[in-house]
Regions:
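Structured non-transmembrane domains adjacent to transmembrane bundles in polytopic membrane proteins
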Residues: 12-35, 43-129, 352-544, 554, ...
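Membrane-embedded transmembrane helical bundles of large multi-pass transporters/channels
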Residues: 1-3, 71, 87, 97-355, ...
């Protein structure tokens, strides 16, 4: 069973979507049979497309393209009368018999081979087709390979063993394969965008390695304490395995929470990624314990690689020290102020964030034919060519007065600010619905284009009162504006839901009011800094070439929502793994400072390793040619760095030192009604200890 991914990002029932459906219904005869591709030509220097020789070359190429049985029709530039003012640029339109997703690679290769004729003749020839892509936008597996290699190095240095480093990679790949297979099969039944596969691969690989890391780390601790292999496997699965299940559930909840936005493609992304995370969790708690039982003492802490031992200095006198934790604890106020101030400064660009959707002009490299076609069309017709608007004018009657009113409305629309050109009103078969095409002066992401769409919709109020004619706007630019608006409206609701859920969840886990509050505020700090950094590099264009972005452009409209859903789960994971140990020590000793010191020493190293592994996987995806995947990879890399290293490893211990015993305050009445949640399975340890104590007493 093959895959059937969709690349269209759309939201049903937006104003632009409704207008588009009216056009489809009323102007059926004008609708293309299938996908359309523009073949853009630029004449050689000192020549025009009107030259007989140039026209002959173009005609030959178009005839060759027509030979493809999948092609329905081909319209030449002269036929469409679309030459630029200087007659040097024009485009042909190739219409296929099938929709974009059904256009085969063979058909794409056919058209790519055909245009080599005009290219060889010195006529620049480029292709652009909306949902029909000709340049390779896949990650080709290289991004995953880079991430896995870096993760392997981090694991090898963490555990001082190549064998131990390989186990999390192995189980993560198994989980990833299961998740990917499930998503690919799912595309045959529901609409799933191809970017969902990349997002799921990112998360599935990262959490798969991290979750295995936590369980293996606990297994080795038990072996070091003298437990047998079966006991160590059981305890590691019961304790760290329980924490992994909790961690996985928080990530899954965050991803499934994307469905509250009621945006279909976001829901599909969330469900796809959640399925892969679920596969990673199941492999970690089912398959990994079996593998640990097989390798047994071969991965015990004493079995260290000599080469890595020399490089890391493992086993030397400072091996058990925690210099960073000690530094933070000695200067908590200064560290807190500096860390919060740093994140606040990095967050500043967030306040001028401009959301948009991908276009060939902002997401494609100049090495791609789509981007070169985009630039040629811009050169010929201006930025507004890519932001064409279709206005639907609806009347209740089909009379001569209606037609006159429509013509008047078309002229009035032409007088609106930033309008480059307007076509006459074209009547539909019913005589009640007219279509008016508007070309703005500005591009699809320009605020002036957004203002123009708003002005047309505002004018509808006037025409309804005066002529009983409703105006509706559609077109790619209008669709994008509506999608961005819908996402912007969903963002605060989704953020409030996630933050509220995180607070309640952590109150249950830590039985404290202030620690969850600190965790949530830390999450908001890291989120703000992440979006600030992404705006600085992607939207403002600073050093964008270093990161491989072809041009500065708006932030992907759905990136903030996705980032909140994913970062919520990861942030809560780090908080739980770090603070759970602190709570355990505080419960036994009542000493808040000792709890923080021991928590940082015991859990800090694993949290750092987990953060580095996450970052290595996400950095790998920043190497992807597709700027959508690249921007998601960048955002998640910054998000993990800020949250794991600045918030959890710096601000959390510093603030907890300042709070002292009050950090663990919980009203007695609330303590009585809250259920006890044993995230790390410590009750298992207590039962084992009690059992061993009884055996010891019996043998005395």
């Amino acid at each position: 069973m093959g895959s059937s991914f969709k690349d269209e990002l759309s939201i049903p029932n937006t104003p632009a979507d409704k207008a588009g459906k009216v056009i489809e219904k009323e102007f059926k005869a004008m609708q293309p049979a299938g996908a359309q591709v523009k073949v853009t030509f630029k004449a050689p220097k000192n020549e025009t497309l009107e030259s007989a020789e140039v026209q002959q070359k173009i005609a030959g190429v178009l005839e060759e393209i027509k030979k493809d049985s999948a092609v329905d029709s081909v319209a030449a530039p002269m036929q469409l009368q679309n030459l630029s003012e200087d007659k040097t640029i024009g485009y042909a339109v190739v219409t296929y018999k099938v929709k974009a997703e059904k256009v085969t690679e063979a058909s794409k290769d056919k058209i790519l081979d055909s245009i080599e004729t005009t290219r060889d003749a010195g006529i620049q020839t480029e292709l652009s087709g909306g949902d029909v892509t000709f340049s390779d936008s896949e990650t080709s597996g290289m991004t995953e390979i880079v991430g896995v290699l870096v993760a392997f190095v981090v694991l090898a240095f963490t555990f001082v063993s190549f064998l131990v480093a390989g186990l999390p990679i192995l189980t993560a790949i198994i989980g990833l394969a299961i998740g990917m297979l499930g998503i690919i099969i799912g595309t045959n039944y529901v609409e799933i965008q191809s970017v969902s596969l990349s997002l799921a691969a990112m998360l599935g690989l990262a959490v798969g390695i991290d979750y295995a890391l936590f369980i293996i780390n606990r297994f080795r601790q038990q072996l070091a304490q003298g437990d047998s292999v079966p006991e160590s496997v059981a305890i590691a699965t019961g304790t760290a395995g329980s924490a992994v299940i909790f961690a996985g559930l928080t990530v899954i909840i965050g991803l499934l929470g994307l469905s509250v936005t009621k945006i279909p493609f976001l829901t599909a992304m969330g469900v796809s990624a959640a399925f892969t995370v679920l596969a990673a969790v199941l492999v970690s708690v089912i398959i990994l314990p079996a593998i640990l039982g097989l390798v047994g003492h071969k991965i015990a802490p004493s079995k260290q690689n000599r080469f890595l031992q020399k490089m890391t200095g493992a086993g030397k006198k400072h091996a058990g020290s925690n210099k960073w934790g000690e530094f933070v604890i000695r200067r908590p106020l200064i560290v807190t102020i500096f860390a919060i101030g740093l994140l606040a400064v990095i967050s500043i660009p967030f306040f001028h964030m401009n959301l948009g959707l991908p276009s060939d002009g902002t997401t494609k490299s100049t090495e791609t034919t789509e981007r070169r076609a985009y630039d040629l069309l811009t050169e010929a017709y201006g930025e507004g060519f890519h932001a064409s608007l279709m206005v639907v004018a609806k009347s209740e009657e089909a009379t001569a007065e209606t037609q006159n009113a429509m013509n008047t409305i078309a002229k009035e629309l032409g007088n609106l600010p930033d309008v480059k050109s307007v076509t006459p009103a074209i009547p539909g078969p019913s005589g009640k619905i007219y279509m008016i095409s508007i070309t703005p002066k500005t591009g699809p992401d320009d605020t002036k284009t957004k203002d123009l769409v708003k002005a047309i919709r505002d004018k509808s109020n006037q025409t309804e009162k005066k002529n009983e004619i409703e105006l509706m706007v559609t077109g790619t630019a209008a669709m994008n504006i509506d999608i961005v608006q819908k996402l912007s409206d969903a963002l605060p609701v989704f953020a409030a839901l996630i933050v509220g859920l995180a607070y309640v969840l952590l109150v249950l886990v830590f039985r404290s009011l202030l620690i969850p509050l600190k965790a949530v505020l830390g999450f908001l700090l890291s989120l703000g800094a992440t979006l600030g950094a992404v705006v600085f590099f992607v939207q403002d264009g600073h050093f964008h070439n270093i990161f491989g972005f072809p041009a500065a452009g708006p932030i992907l409209a759905f990136l903030p929502v996705i980032l909140i859903g994913i970062l919520f789960g990861l942030a809560m994971d780090y908080e739980v793994f770090l603070v759970s140990k602190m709570r355990e020590v505080y419960t036994h000793t009542g000493d808040p400072k000792r709890a923080i010191v021991e928590g940082m020493r015991e859990s800090g190293r694993v949290v750092v390793a987990a953060g580095l592994i996450m970052m290595s996987v996400f950095i790998g995806f920043m190497l992807a040619p597709d700027t959508i995947i690249k921007s998601i990879g960048m955002a998640l890399t910054f998000g993990v760095f800020f949250d794991a290293f600045i918030v959890r490893m710096t601000i959390v211990p510093a603030v907890m030192i300042l709070m002292g015993n009050s950090a663990w305050y919980l009203p007695k009445w609330l303590d009585k009604i809250l259920p006890n949640i044993d995230v790390e399975g410590e009750s298992i340890i207590h039962r084992v200890e009690n059992k061993n104590e009884k055996i010891y007493k019996q043998n005395r």
